[in-house]
Amino acid sequence: MPGQQATKHESLLDQLSLKGKVVVVTGASGPKGMGIEAARGCAEMGAAVAITYASRAQGAEENVKELEKTYGIKAKAYKCQVDSYESCEKLVKDVVADFGQIDAFIANAGATADSGILDGSVEAWNHVVQVDLNGTFHCAKAVGHHFKERGTGSLVITASMSGHIANFPQEQTSYNVAKAGCIHMARSLANEWRDFARVNSISPGYIDTGLSDFVPKETQQLWHSMIPMGRDGLAKELKGAYVYFASDASTYTTGADLLIDGGYTTR
């Protein structure tokens, strides 16, 4: 018999509460990215939060101070290179040692692409796939053992609408392929981990995080014209989705992918 049970809470507020839970968010060292907004959302709902950085230690520490001061929760930053399984394995061990458990893991760290396969190098392709796809696998494998041992857990993968469509006019095949893999990884793991954990993905569209600032303005204007809502999304508009998947409000949701793209993929 499957081991995962329905929430015991009747109140929606209680279902969405993350009090007593520990949430890990990778890639949360920036001031306005999806990672820190996911961490803010979880902290606002009462979770203790562990965030990671690859190189921006100062940014991560500043975010930790903000989370603790604003929400009155325990927070800590960890260095983690998701392209290394050993680094992800160490992260899980360190968080469990410091917090006692992990209830939800948001695999958010990623890399962007700036060329197609003919103009780009083999090294550039391998970097994007290693970080975005294999990095997500490393996080999943590392925390999956902990979830199985506890008999409960929620893995939330930051995928992308680019895993559903081929972006135009910018060329980023490596990124599209990696994110499509993340979406199917979530579906596959939802089945593989059906007895002890839920796995879902979130596919954001164009979100104003600063990572696309290198894209020419005329290109950005073109893609805005292709979005029914006519603008980039804000990272804070994703907080509710991350909280939902991390919380007991989603105890019957697994293998799902939530598109949050301003309607881009409807066209």
UniProtKB/Swiss-Prot annotation:
Zinc is among the record's keywords: no
Catalytic residue list: 160, 175, 179
Annotated catalysed reactions: D-mannitol + NADP(+) = D-fructose + NADPH + H(+)
A single BP term in Gene Ontology: mannitol metabolic process
CDD domains with a match to the protein in the record: MDH-like_SDR_c
Enzyme Commission code: 1.1.1.138
Gene Ontology MF: a single term: protein homodimerization activity
Keywords: Allergen, NADP, Oxidoreductase
Pfam families per record: adh_short_C2
Residues noted as binding NADP(+) in the record, renumbered to the chain: 108, 141, 175, 179, 207, 209
Source superkingdom: Eukaryota
InterPro entries the UniProt entry points to: NAD(P)-bd_dom_sf (IPR036291), SDR_fam (IPR002347)
Transmembrane segments: none
Function comment: Interconverts D-mannitol and D-fructose. Not active with fructose 6-phosphate or NADH.
Family statement: Belongs to the short-chain dehydrogenases/reductases (SDR) family.
Subunit: Exists as monomer, dimer and tetramer.
The protein's name in its UniProt record: NADP-dependent mannitol dehydrogenase
Biological source species: Davidiella tassiana
